[in-house]
Amino acid sequence: MRYLPLTDTDRSEMLSVVGASSIDDLFVDVPKEARLDGPIRDLPMHASEMAVEKHMRARAAKNLVAGDVPFFLGAGAYRHHVPASVDHIIQRGEFLTAYTPYQPEIAQGTLQMLFEFQTQVAKLYGCEVANASMYDGSTACWEAISMASRVTKRNRAVLSGALHPHYSEVAKTMAKYLGLEIADAQPAIQAAPDNAGLTSRIDENTSCVVVQYPDILGRIADLTEIAEAAHAKGALLIVVNTEPVALGAIKSPGEMGADIVVGEGQSLGVGLQFGGPYLGLFAVRDKKHVRQMPGRLCGETVDAEGKRGFVLTLSTREQHIRREKATSNICTNSGLCALAFSVHMTLLGEVGLRRLAAENHRLACLTADRLAKVPGVTVLNDTFFNEFTIQVGQDAREIVRTLADKGVLAGVSLGRLYPDVERLSDALIVATTETTSEDDIEALGSALEEVLA
């Protein structure tokens, strides 16, 4: 069959259906300075492959690469060491595919991998059931809010002010078109989360309360009180975790009464990768809610001969069967990233994960102690895992830029995450992992002393 490209008439009809007057209207959300409106600058129209590679390598050399400089960026994406065996396994031909395993008779390897992944996530989160992954943490968070609305038959979600703002923005964007109310807030710059203020916002119309653990400022708090307050009003507690390594050291959300636990799985097995692809994790504490869960579910069964096998189960929830009545519009899963996560978790084991978590926390404590000695720096947190917030007494965005020029990636400024909230502009989120050396910590402390002098 010959391929027939779109005609101008086809394009006009499609634009008319979606209410756009031109192709440019489809990209109005992309800032003009980020759009390519002509040939790539500094690159000739025609060049050999070798010349293009040389040019692009020269451009790439201007980047500050995480492994080459002291690196303290976090705020939802973390640099951890990924064993070489992870990449080796996920690149095997049996796994390196975008195919969804609808036919169990030819996909037992993939299905078993997904089943093992679900088991690991459920245990990590302290839940009974986990799905076979989602796109990333922010979309998993939204799907949890949507699920809570279906379960409770309510449409108001209360978001903690200490939830990552990118997660809040995704939720608000989706809710805008689906008739749900998102009650969000801004973070309070204080040593401990304001649990009392959060619980006071719960009412009889609330479908769920969404909290982050550890939160955007790195703080850790017992969530039992919030769970009890939510349940007393008939609402669900959704807990977001952006750093799964933390759960090797702190209590799981399910143990504290969370009904739905979601998060970002990038820390285990998946590199930073310029922001993606990442890995959404999704689990529920009580399997009575399983039919309202989004995404794929892989189950264990026996075949006609009584042999153990794996299949996609409860598929009537899904888009390929229920279409517009499906529990979500997710029509595949981040299978390869899920495999990377599962391989890394398996290589670590329970003891290895706890040791990794302990090392992350140890280095964070060393970093906090060093920065507390810098004149003009205040360490905000009473509690933290591998990430904490400092106040530097001036615009932290400028501090980050200045230190980047000195070859130190100092952290993520709250001013970058909340550009319209002036009172947050002097706060800087600093993250450490097992890849952080004591020399890196000293480099950050010395650079801050020089800049703040």
Curated annotation (Swiss-Prot):
Endoplasmic reticulum found in the keyword field: no
Entry keywords, A to Z: Oxidoreductase
A Pfam short name: GDC-P
One GO term of the biological process aspect: glycine decarboxylation via glycine cleavage system
A GO MF label: glycine dehydrogenase (decarboxylating) activity
Gene3D superfamilies linked to this entry: Aspartate Aminotransferase, domain 1 (3.90.1150.10), Type I PLP-dependent aspartate aminotransferase-like (Major domain) (3.40.640.10)
Family statement drawn from the similarity comment of this UniProt entry: Belongs to the GcvP family. N-terminal subunit subfamily.
Entry protein name: Probable glycine dehydrogenase (decarboxylating) subunit 1
